Amino acid sequence: MKSEPDTFGINDLYNKPNQTEHWDGVRNYQARNMMRDDMKLGDLVFFYHSNCDVPGIVGIMEVVKEGYPDFSAFDPDDKHFDPKSDPEHPRWIMVDVKYVKTLSRTITLKELKTHEELADLALVRPGNRLSIMPVSKGQWEFILSLE
């Protein structure tokens, strides 16, 4: 799961009450579908800092609430407002995540791209800009071995 650290970084999650926050504002159907269909209670996910000096994986979170309507889409004063989404027919989904740990070092995008074992990782393939991307069990274990 990607976020810009200037907007919401791993330290922001760490400092939240119960170190938990809803992951709102996702406005891409593919990413929404992953949150709705694939992310399950107890799943561990990487926290990735994007659009910063050193983009990379900085931590781990746990899904503590499965997909439910993203209420930021219903609020006209919210930057994620979507007039075509309403509580009766929500268009957007969010999950709640809990801080698990900050990695001992950032595993940079540049480094991830150098490993043949990660050639199929969506993040390292050209044109993949989704804020949420799948990671296989093998990829997960390999990335953790880099820490």
Stretch-by-stretch model annotation:
Residues N11-L13, A73-F74, T108-K110, I143-L146:
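A short secondary-structure junction signal
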Residues M1-L41, Q139-W140, E147:
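Compositionally biased, charged N-terminal/linker segments
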Residues R129-E147:
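Charged phosphate-binding loop/patch that engages nucleotide di/tri-phosphates or the phosphate backbone
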Residues G59-L130:
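Aromatic- and Lys/Arg-enriched surface recognition patch
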Residues D43-F46, V95-V97:
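Hydrophobic/aromatic beta-strand segments within beta-rich folds
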Residues F46-F47, E62:
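Hydrophobic beta-strand signal
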Residues Y48-P55:
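Short, charged beta-turn/beta-strand-edge "cap" motif at the junction between a beta-strand
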Residues K2-E4, Y48, V100, G127, ...:
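Structured loops at beta-to-helix junctions and adjacent beta-edge loops in soluble globular domains
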